[in-house]
Amino acid sequence: MNQPGLWVQLDHLSGPQRTLLQHLTFGVEPGQCLTLIGPSGVGKSALLAAIAGTLDMLAADDTPPLHCQAQVWLNGRCISGLPCHQRQVGLVWQHPTLFAHLTVAQNLLLAVPSGAKAQRLRQVSQALERAGLAGFESRHPATLSGGQASRVALMRALLAKPEALLLDEPFAALDPALRGELRAWVLEQAKTQSIPVLLVTHLAEDIADPQRVLELSNV
């Protein structure tokens, strides 16, 4: 599919006991946001993981992995068979995964493209300031609140300059005022950088565009 943006043709997403999703086709154009809604357990998070190439990471030690048969295109290239680190997709979970042994700045530096150290540190400081976390460079994840950790994870995803951004309820742990401010900032950055965004939420106020909502239901 030789089109800009993120395009998905899913045949099925299933576990050992049942099929979660099937026969699903959708696309998100550059700079736009498509919101995914649906009941708990329908497969919203699993769909994001399948697009990002991290579906096998969702399975617990005693849980059989999910299986997905789908074709995914990103800016004209098929990424379905690529490992996650080659897909150029940013993924932020509701419960952020930060490296506990690294400081906030070190976590963010992992996502900054190569360059002079001073320049990279400046990018990190600017990102933290935009997220309302100025001065948090030397903090460790264990000292952060849930909302602060979510903001660091969002900044890390954007600093990596992804070609698509997948968000799994990343604003849920934030207070209402900050949630609205950060959501608007993230979507504005995505629009400015022409990044397609796929957002999972259960909050009506998180819906960026009522005309761009995909409701998932159980098979």
Predicted features and spans:
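ABC-type ATPase nucleotide-binding domains, specifically the catalytic core motifs of the NBD
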Residues: 56-59, 83, 102, 106-121, ...
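ABC ATPase NBD coupling module
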Residues: 66-68, 74-94, 114
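Conserved ABC ATPase "signature" region
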Residues: 119-136, 187-188
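Conserved ABC ATPase signature
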Residues: 140-144, 148
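A short, proline-enriched helix->beta-strand linker immediately N-terminal to the Walker B motif
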Residues: 159-163
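Catalytic Walker B motif of ABC-type/P-loop ATPase nucleotide-binding domains
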Residues: 165-169
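Conserved H-loop
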Residues: 194-201
